[in-house]
Amino acid sequence: MPTGIFTNAWITQSAKILFRGSTPPDSTKFRLALANSASLGRTNSLADFISSELLPTNNYARAAASFSGDGTYETTDQRHELPVISASFSASGGSLQFQTAFLIADSLAVSSKSFTNSNVNATTDRIAITSHSFVNGDKLVFTADALATLPGGITAGTIYQVASVTTDDFQLQPNGGGSTVNITDTGSGTFRARSANGIIVAYAVESSPITVPDGQGYSYQIPLVVLNSGYVTGS
């Protein structure tokens, strides 16, 4: 795996956790996700990363990436070493191709749900997705598939908040709450409601796209260390 880089957002959040008492992420909700893009970087937003994530086809799913323990301080190398995370992906029904892997804290297991313009009610401002599993307050980003146009009132690259949930449909609010989003038309084609809970911790970009053939797997071993820059021994 290429060297991982912390995002600016995670560095800021870490400072708030360490020195201002902000709530740390749930240790069971770290997940590794994949994107077939080489253009994501440390300044990109959560919405940028989530909008680029692979679709849940050919068996793609976010991989659990939880630490098995606290790790130990390595006196020789002068750094605290956390247990290595193992995250695996497997292709089925077709290949998977990606170039960037990114770690999400406080994430949902589901990456995205698909729906079409026929599932959008511009009168009630509701989106119908059978057994969607979202709950009030969950964050979503919407994208349109090729040749599709998002419903009026929903903007690509914008994080929305799920509201007025039932088992099979929901409304939207602006991120952080507020009035129900007014859906002015149903749009056209197929869309994706992409899960945007959490924060992007770190990412790694491969030098060229990686293809996981149908029926095969690919594993990431993710080492994470904490150190004082300039004092560590080794690499």
Show which residues each predicted segment covers.
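Small cysteine-rich, disulfide-bonded extracellular modules of the LU/uPAR three-finger superfamily
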Residues: 1-99, 105-111, 194-235
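Small/polar beta-strand repeat architecture
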Residues: 111-195
